[in-house]
Design a protein with these regions (language model features):
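Short, surface-exposed coil-to-beta transition loops
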Residues: 60-63, 90-95
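Short, cysteine-centered beta-strand-loop-beta hairpins and adjacent loop/turn segments enriched
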Residues: 54-57, 82-91
Length: 123
């Protein structure tokens, strides 16, 4: 299984506001944890993204990608930039650890970023 390509696909789906595409890459029961927030399921994550970003017209872009692929795990550092239609944008460094099962489906995502960097954008 090509975890590098599957990780590319995951972030492409997030950037395209494609909840179905994200779901297709994930195993049943996938768990997601961001910073010190409670662990959530995929439905809760995508509902939050839809409310805060996707339905609000906030675009997501990834840059400066640094990725390490190991056995059933990918660790990626990148800069994520969120941009509103009025041109206002905010960026933060992010570290994401993605775990995969034997079929290459995502079983867990742990993501760490400075959420305060996005406060002015989302208020």
């Amino acid at each position: 299984m090509d975890l590098d390509s599957r990780t590319d696909d995951l972030f492409a789906c997030f950037a395209a506001d494609d909840a179905d595409g994200v779901a297709a890459l994930c195993a049943p029961g996938v768990r997601i944890k961001q910073n010190n927030a409670p662990e959530v399921d995929l439905e809760t994550l995508t509902a939050g993204l839809r409310a805060m970003l996707w339905d609000a017209g906030v675009a997501t872009a990834y840059s400066d990608v640094r990725r390490t692929v190991a056995d059933r795990v990918v660790t990626e550092q990148h800069v994520v930039t969120l941009s509103r239609a009025d041109g206002f944008a905010a960026s933060s460094d992010v570290c994401t650890v993605i775990r995969f099962d034997d079929e290459g489906l995502i079983t867990r995502i742990d993501e760490y970023f400075d959420s305060a960097a996005f406060g002015p954008l989302l208020s």
